[in-house]
C-alpha cells in the first residue's frame, strides 16, 4: 500500500484521506470507551489490585496515551472479570466425589471448567469487546501502513508480560498453599497469554483453542507439582479428594484431564494398602479355613498344655451337643413316620469314617481300642496325653442314642430296636464272634449290626448278591461334629452298604411288619410280589397295542368324514341326528334364497 503511494499521487491522496477519516472515528470511540470503562470497573479494579501486584490503572492509561493500543484492551481484560469464573466462587464449589469415584472416572468431563464460563476473549454480540477488537485490528493495519512506532511498544509489552509471568512463578513458590493467589495467578497468566496471542492477528483466532490449552495446563501443573511434595514429607497431610475444606483438593482439580496418578491415585491407595499385621493375617486365615470343633482342643493339648488336664466344661458341652443331635435325628424319624431320610444317615456315616481315619493317621487307634472299658476319667487322662477325645465322645453319644431311643421318645411307627435287643445282640457277639480290631464294642456294636433307613428294611434276604465287604458295614452314630464340612475331606468316603445280608439278622425289623399277617406270611407275600415284578419287567409289550395306536392315527380323519351310525336306542343320539338334519335343511333354504336374490334385477 505504501509502495503504491510512491508512484501515483491519486492513490496516495485517497489513502491519506482514508487514514484521516478512520483515525478520527477511532479516536472518538476510543475516548468514549476510555471514559466509560474506568467508571464502571472501579470496585473490581480494587479487588484485582489487592490480589496481585501487576500494573495499576494509571500505568495502563499512560501506556495507552504513549501509543500502545493493547494497553486499553489489557485494562479492559482486567476490569471485566466475570464473577462466575472468579477464584472466590471456585473455592465455594462443593465437590461431592469420593476417592473411589475420582479414581474410576478420573474426572473425565466433556466440557472443561474454562468453557463453562465466557472467557476474556469470547466475543459477545453487541458487547464492548467486539468493538474494541475491531478497532484494535484496524489500528494494527494503520500502524503497519504508517511507520513502525508500535514495534517498540509491543516489545515493551512483551517484556512486561514476561516480568508478570516471573512474578506469578515467584508468588507460587512463596505461597504454595494459598488457593486464591494460585487461582488469580492462573487467570493473570492466562490473560497475558491471550494478549501475546492477539498480537499475531487472524492466525491466532483460527488456532485459538489450540494455543490456549497448553498454557492453562502448564500453569495448573506447576501448582500441582508444587503442592505434591508436602504430603511426601508428612504422612498426616494426606488429603482425601472428597474433603471439601482442604485447599489441596481444590488446587489439584484445576483442569479436567490434568489429574495425574500422583494427584488422585497415589496417596489414597497408600492409605488403603497398608501391610497386614500378624493379627490381621491370622484372623483372615482362620476365616478361610472351615471350622472343625476338635482341632483347637487338640492343638492346645498337644503343643501348649502337655501336662494339663482337658477342659471338662468343654467336654460336657460337646457331649450335650451330641445328645441334642441324636434327639433331633430321632425326632425327624418320628415326624416322618418312618419315611426314608437317607441323606442324614449318609452324612453321619461320612463323618464317622472321617473321624476314624483321622484317628488312624495319628496312630492312636490301638490305645483307643484298649480303652473300651475305661471310665470317663481314664479317657480324660488319655486326652491330656495328646489323644483326641474321640472315644469318650462316641461312648457318651452311644449311651445317649440308646437312652433317647428307649425312654425319651415313644415309637408308634418306628421299628428301631429297643435297648434290650441291642444288649442281647452285644452278648451274642461277645460269645460267638470276635470283634474286628478297629471297632469298639460300644462303637457301632460290631459289623454285624446293620443299620438301615428307619422303617425301610423288611428283614427279607432279597439281594444276597449285594453283600458288601466286612469293613463297609459301619454303624452310623450321632457322634458327628455339628459343623461337619465334607469339602475338607481328602479321601473318598464309600457309604453305600447293603440293606440286608443273608447271614445276619437285621435287628431293625424285630417288630411286626404287618398286623394282618404274621412275619412268615409277609415274607411269602413279598417273595411272590418280587417274582411277579420280575415277570412284568421282562415281558415285552404286545403288538396289538401298537397296531391299535397306529390305526387310530391313520383312520382319524376318515372317521370324521363318515361318523358311525348312531344307536337307535339312545334318545340323545336321535336328538342330535334330527338337529343336524334341521341345520342342513336351513342351510339349503338360505342358499336358495340367496340365489334367487342374485338372479333378480334390482330396480333403483
Swiss-Prot record:
Tissue and organ distribution: Detected in ciliated sensory neurons at all stages of development, and in adult testis.
Entry coiled-coil feature ranges: none
Chief localization: other
UniProt protein name: Protein hemingway
GO cellular component assignments: cilium; cytoplasm; perikaryon
Function: Involved in assembly and/or maintenance of motile cilia. Required during spermatogenesis for axoneme elongation. Necessary for optimal function of the chordotonal (hearing) organs.
Region (Disordered): 1-70, 103-309, 359-387, 544-585
Species in which this protein is naturally found: Drosophila melanogaster
Bias kind Acidic residues: ranges: 8-38, 135-183, 194-214, 288-300
Protein location: Cell projection, Cilium; Perikaryon; Cytoplasm
GO BP terms, alphabetized: detection of mechanical stimulus involved in sensory perception of sound; motile cilium assembly; sperm axoneme assembly; sperm individualization; spermatogenesis
Effect of disrupting the coding gene: Viable with no gross coordination or gravitaxis defects. Males are sterile with complete absence of mature spermatozoa, while female fertility is unaffected. In developing spermatids, axonemes fail to elongate normally and sperm individualization is disrupted. Tubulin glycylation of spermatid axonemes is abnormal. Hearing is moderately impaired.
Keyword annotations of the record: Cell projection, Cilium biogenesis/degradation, Cytoplasm, Differentiation, Spermatogenesis
Compositionally biased region (Low complexity): 368-379
Family: Belongs to the CFAP97 family.
Amino acid at each position: 500500500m505504501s509502495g503504491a503511494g510512491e508512484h501515483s499521487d491519486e492513490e496516495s491522496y485517497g489513502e491519506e484521506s482514508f487514514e484521516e477519516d478512520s483515525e478520527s472515528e477511532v479516536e472518538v470511540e476510543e475516548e468514549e470507551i476510555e471514559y466509560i470503562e474506568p467508571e464502571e470497573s472501579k470496585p473490581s479494579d480494587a479487588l484485582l489490585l489487592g490480589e496481585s501486584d501487576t500494573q495499576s490503572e494509571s500505568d495502563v492509561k499512560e501506556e495507552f496515551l504513549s501509543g500502545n493500543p493493547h494497553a486499553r484492551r489489557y485494562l479492559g481484560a482486567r476490569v471485566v472479570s466475570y464473577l462466575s469464573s472468579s477464584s472466590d466462587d471456585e473455592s465455594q464449589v462443593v465437590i461431592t466425589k469420593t476417592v473411589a469415584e475420582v479414581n474410576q472416572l478420573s474426572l473425565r468431563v466433556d466440557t472443561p471448567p474454562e468453557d463453562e464460563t465466557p472467557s476474556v476473549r469470547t466475543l459477545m454480540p453487541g458487547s464492548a469487546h467486539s468493538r474494541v477488537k475491531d478497532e484494535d485490528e484496524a489500528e494494527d493495519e494503520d500502524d503497519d501502513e504508517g511507520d513502525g512506532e508500535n514495534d517498540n511498544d509491543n516489545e515493551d509489552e512483551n517484556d512486561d508480560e514476561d516480568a508478570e509471568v516471573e512474578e506469578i512463578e515467584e508468588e507460587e513458590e512463596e505461597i504454595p498453599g494459598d488457593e486464591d493467589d494460585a487461582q488469580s495467578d492462573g487467570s493473570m497468566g492466562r490473560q497475558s497469554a491471550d494478549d501475546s496471542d492477539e498480537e499475531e492477528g487472524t492466525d491466532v483466532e483460527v488456532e485459538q483453542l489450540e494455543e490456549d490449552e497448553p498454557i492453562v495446563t502448564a500453569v495448573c501443573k506447576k501448582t500441582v507439582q508444587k503442592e505434591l511434595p508436602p504430603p511426601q514429607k508428612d504422612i498426616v497431610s494426606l488429603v482425601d479428594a472428597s474433603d471439601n475444606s482442604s485447599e489441596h483438593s481444590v488446587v489439584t482439580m484445576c483442569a479436567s484431564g490434568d489429574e495425574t496418578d500422583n494427584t488422585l491415585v497415589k496417596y489414597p491407595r497408600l492409605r488403603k494398602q497398608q501391610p497386614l499385621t500378624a493379627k490381621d493375617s491370622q484372623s483372615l486365615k482362620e476365616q478361610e479355613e472351615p471350622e472343625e470343633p476338635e482341632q483347637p482342643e487338640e492343638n492346645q493339648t498337644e503343643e501348649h498344655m502337655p501336662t494339663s488336664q482337658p477342659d471338662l466344661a468343654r467336654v460336657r458341652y460337646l457331649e450335650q451337643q451330641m445328645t441334642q443331635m441324636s434327639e433331633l435325628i430321632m425326632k425327624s424319624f418320628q415326624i416322618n413316620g418312618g419315611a426314608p431320610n437317607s441323606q442324614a444317615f449318609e452324612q453321619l456315616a461320612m463323618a464317622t469314617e472321617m473321624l476314624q481315619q483321622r484317628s488312624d493317621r495319628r496312630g492312636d487307634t490301638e490305645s483307643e481300642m484298649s480303652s473300651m472299658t475305661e471310665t470317663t476319667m481314664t479317657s480324660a487322662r488319655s486326652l491330656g496325653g495328646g489323644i483326641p477325645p474321640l472315644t469318650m465322645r462316641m461312648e457318651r453319644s452311644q449311651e445317649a442314642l440308646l437312652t433317647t431311643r428307649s425312654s425319651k421318645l415313644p415309637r408308634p411307627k418306628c421299628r428301631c430296636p429297643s435297648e434290650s435287643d441291642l444288649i442281647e445282640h452285644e452278648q451274642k457277639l461277645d460269645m460267638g464272634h470276635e470283634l474286628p480290631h478297629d471297632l469298639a464294642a460300644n462303637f457301632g456294636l460290631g459289623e454285624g449290626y446293620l443299620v438301615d433307613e428307619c422303617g425301610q428294611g423288611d428283614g427279607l434276604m432279597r439281594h444276597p448278591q449285594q453283600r458288601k465287604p466286612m469293613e463297609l458295614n459301619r454303624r452310623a452314630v450321632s457322634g458327628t461334629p455339628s459343623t461337619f464340612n465334607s469339602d475338607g475331606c481328602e479321601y473318598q468316603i464309600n457309604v453305600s452298604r447293603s440293606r440286608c445280608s443273608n447271614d445276619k439278622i437285621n435287628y431293625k425289623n424285630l417288630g411286626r411288619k404287618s398286623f394282618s399277617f404274621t412275619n412268615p406270611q409277609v415274607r411269602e407275600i413279598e417273595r411272590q410280589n418280587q417274582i411277579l415284578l420280575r415277570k412284568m419287567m421282562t415281558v415285552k409289550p404286545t403288538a396289538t397295542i401298537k397296531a391299535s395306536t397306529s390305526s387310530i392315527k391313520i383312520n382319524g380323519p376318515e372317521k370324521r368324514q363318515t361318523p358311525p351310525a348312531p344307536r337307535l336306542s339312545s334318545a340323545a343320539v336321535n336328538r342330535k341326528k334330527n338337529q343336524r338334519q334341521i341345520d342342513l335343511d336351513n342351510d339349503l333354504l338360505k342358499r336358495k334364497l340367496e340365489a334367487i336374490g342374485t338372479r333378480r334385477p334390482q330396480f333403483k
